[in-house]
């Protein structure tokens, strides 16, 4: 088996995997104030600076289907026998529906695009797991089974500080954002079972929201040693450190602080903090 793994630039994974020859990343076009940016050439912090200074709402669009089609044809010519594509959830992006037909277009390759239901670091962690298993010589069917097990065990909760970013992204009405701000509501967001970002609970004050997120962490990960924990933020270092310290104090032994990439940060806004848990590799 010769396996290629394809993902998109919403996935965040460890630096070492960027050198893997069988990993391919599709760019999600993104722009601020009419200027397009290459996500492979801009750091998270540089993007946050652009967000803070932007006159208009940053805009994202789908990866190009033609680009994926060309890549798949090249992979077939290179002798790849299997392709696994792990992309933004269908509930977030129409890309998944647009590329679904490509799974049956290649006679010499088995092409599979399973639903992921999550993004950011948890999606990147699934990419890492698949690459590790392929490197170890694990069969394709077993890799798919492990991916599904990890995906179905993923959970993520987010504290959004400024509701106006959600309103700008179309996930909350302007009226609701204004009212929520006046009432000091700091909602807990999550990914639904279909992969849609939705309000899990409406909580007043940051302190209460942070407390609720800690409760949810313990509820979802009853065996701390069985899970990888990502604490993810957009310039919310103090809150991220608080969640990190709490996770360690509760017996989690694989906890990492990371930052949201531009695609997700654009929708959640600055000063957002989250955690994502994934069953370990």
Swiss-Prot record:
Keywords: Lipid-binding. Gene3D superfamilies: 3.30.1180.10, 3.40.50.10170. Pfam families: DegV (PF02645). It comes from the Bacteria. One of its GO terms (molecular function) is lipid binding. Hexadecanoate binds at residues 60, 93. May bind long-chain fatty acids, such as palmitate, and may play a role in lipid transport or fatty acid metabolism. This is DegV domain-containing protein YqaC.
């Amino acid at each position: 088996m010769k396996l290629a793994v394809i993902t998109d630039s919403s996935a965040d994974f460890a630096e070492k995997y960027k050198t893997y020859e069988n990993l391919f990343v599709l760019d999600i076009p993104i722009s601020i104030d009419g200027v397009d940016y290459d996500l492979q050439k801009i750091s998270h912090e540089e993007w946050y600076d652009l967000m803070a200074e932007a006159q208009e709402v940053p805009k994202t669009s789908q990866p190009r289907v033609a680009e994926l089609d060309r890549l798949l044809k090249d992979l077939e010519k290179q002798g790849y026998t299997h392709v696994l594509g792990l992309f933004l959830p269908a509930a977030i992006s129409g890309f998944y529906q647009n590329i679904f037909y490509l799974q049956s277009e290649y006679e010499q390759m088995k092409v599979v695009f399973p639903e992921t239901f999550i993004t950011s670091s948890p999606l990147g962690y699934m990419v890492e797991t698949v690459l590790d298993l392929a490197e170890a010589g694990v069969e394709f069917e077993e890799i798919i089974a492990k991916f599904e097990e990890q995906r179905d065990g993923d959970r993520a909760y987010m504290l959004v500080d400024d509701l106006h970013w959600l309103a700008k992204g179309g996930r909350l009405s302007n009226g609701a954002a204004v009212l929520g701000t006046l009432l000091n509501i700091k909602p807990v967001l999550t990914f639904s079972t279909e992969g849609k970002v939705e309000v899990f609970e409406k909580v007043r004050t940051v302190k209460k929201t942070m407390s609720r997120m800690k409760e949810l962490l313990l509820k979802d990960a009853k065996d701390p040693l069985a899970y990888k924990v990502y604490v993810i933020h957009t310039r919310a270092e103090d809150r991220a450190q608080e969640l990190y310290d709490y996770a360690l104090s509760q017996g989690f032994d694989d906890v990492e602080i990371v930052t949201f990439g531009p695609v997700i940060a654009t929708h959640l806004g600055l000063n957002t903090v989250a955690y994502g848990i994934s069953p370990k590799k």
